[in-house]
Amino acid sequence: MKKATIITVAFLLLAAATIFFANRKRGEWIEEKRFQMATVTKIVIPRTKNSGTIIQEAFAAIDEVERAASRFIPESEINSLNDGQWHKLSPVLLPMWEKARELYELSGGRFDPTAGKLISLWGFGPEGIKKEPTAEEIEEALRLTGLDKVETSNDFIRLPKGMRLDLNSLAAGYAADRAAAVLKKHGLTKFLVDAGGEIVCASPGKKIWDIGIKDPESENETSVISLYNGAVSTSGSYANFYKSGSNSVTHIVDARTGKAAKTSLLSVSVVARDGIAADGLSTMLFCLPPEEGKKFPANAMFIEEVGGKLKTTKTGEWENLEKWRAKQDSNLRPTD
């Protein structure tokens, strides 16, 4: 799992601040879970005569993203792209590729979707061999890393033979978006989709979703934010790492150097209009030097360890979201 867990999801009535899940009427909502994308996914919708069928269709949309983008499924679309030939990207994979290219440019190349070989080399790919690579191994993998080496033409793409795409930093958020699109298609205006901590939610009127963000050093919440409509994602070095001697090796790799990211950051959380933006931005901001990331125009919370103590920095509208002053999309200024 790429993500730090986002916990304590509750539906609140703003005026009374009543925790809906603690006091909900029996049978008013349906909540189902699945194991998908190597994590637990959850969908919460109002109970109707068609809710069972609708929720299954939404889970199927998540399956579709996994079949397209998972490097852990040998026959997935993304694994078919490494033969050096031209391929037409499917309507499922194409939006992820386009968002990844955008984040590559915004990050100055630190966020690079072509870093699949590096990610595997450091032990976080399908091979699962967790060891620090040699300088020679890193140099070899870097020769097959770099979005500037990829050829594109409209919806077609050609990678150098042996290059590996990795869109894991976008896939869960995008899967939540696809599931949410199914729910909206069926006329639902109140719902929550949780794809392993990548949350997309919607609610009309004064009812809001209350979402707690996990403290990197405990099981408590370090922040609780409120949303009418939008998405939230957290990337963290503490959620997926291994020890190599005295070093902690994180799953987030700097594609420019080929080395696992070394940073004071423990987590970055982002609120955006949709899941793919929140998911990708939380990873991109984690890849940037902390002071550079904090200047980026996003609704974000950075938690880092400085001098043995935790330091929290909130940007954009984060503090307003914490104070229950959730705003409609037109006022929230979400990052696309």
Predicted features along the sequence, with ranges:
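Mature catalytic core of soluble alpha/beta enzymes
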Residues: 2-329, 336
